[in-house]
Design a protein with these regions (language model features):
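Dynamic helix-loop-helix/coil hinge segments at AAA+ ATPase domain boundaries and subdomain interfaces
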Residues: 3-26
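Short regulatory helix/loop adjacent to the ATP-binding pocket of P-loop NTPases
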Residues: 140-156
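AAA+/P-loop NTPase substrate/partner-engagement loops
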Residues: 25, 63-98, 107
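Conserved Walker B catalytic segment
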Residues: 105-128, 147-148
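Walker A/P-loop nucleotide-binding motif
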Residues: 37-58
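Structural recognition of the conserved hydrophobic beta-strand(s) that form the central parallel beta-sheet
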Residues: 75-76, 131-137
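Conserved AAA+ ATPase "SRH/arginine-finger" region at the nucleotide-binding site
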Residues: 157-166
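Walker B catalytic acidic pair
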Residues: 102-104, 137
Length: 166
């Protein structure tokens, strides 16, 4: 059965514009690709709009899928993932090897029940060494209205800042 990965293959590491302000994030992303679920889990990338977060997240997914087509990869925006409990449950039941969630700061706009469901999803993946990659417009400690137990988990792996590519 073919799963919709949500990936756009135009986003690759090869066409990611590397500079001083994003070298660490790229290096961490490549380490995740090579050590899926074992290194920097979760990988949390933050930066302002236009800094290349989505490009880097998509490149991770594309490279994992290219290297290991049998791996189950899902890229999804936080808005789509967190729109209701059923979507979270659907993603949880799919047993992805790599879950990439873009714009996780949206979690702060959701009620405790949705945050609880995401907490459970995160834990169910992490305990099985499934890789989680998150992006946000701010570092974990600056997330507004996100439960502290989630913020703690977001910092378990590697946190990397991207500076704008402009």
């Amino acid at each position: 059965m073919m799963v919709n990965t949500g990936l756009d293959n135009k986003y690759q590491f090869e066409n990611f514009i590397e500079k001083d302000g994003n070298a660490l994030a790229k290096k961490g992303s490549l380490a995740v690709v090579e050590n899926l679920g074992l290194k920097y889990n979760p990988l949390y990338i933050y930066g302002e709009s236009g800094s290349g977060k989505t490009h880097l997240l998509q490149a991770i997914g594309n490279k994992v899928f290219e290297n290991n087509p049998e791996k189950r990869v899902k890229y999804i925006s936080a808005e789509n993932l967190l729109e209701n409990e059923l979507e979270i449950q659907k993603v949880r039941s799919e047993e992805f090897d790599l879950l990439i969630v873009d714009d996780i700061q949206i979690l702060g706009e959701k009620d405790d029940m949705i945050q609880e469901k995401f907490f459970n999803l995160f834990n169910s993946l992490h305990v099985k060494d499934k890789q989680i990659v998150l992006s946000s417009d701010s570092e974990p400690d600056q997330l507004k209205n996100v439960q502290s137990r989630l913020i703690v988990r977001f910092k378990w792996g590697m946190t990397a800042c991207l500076t704008s590519i402009e």
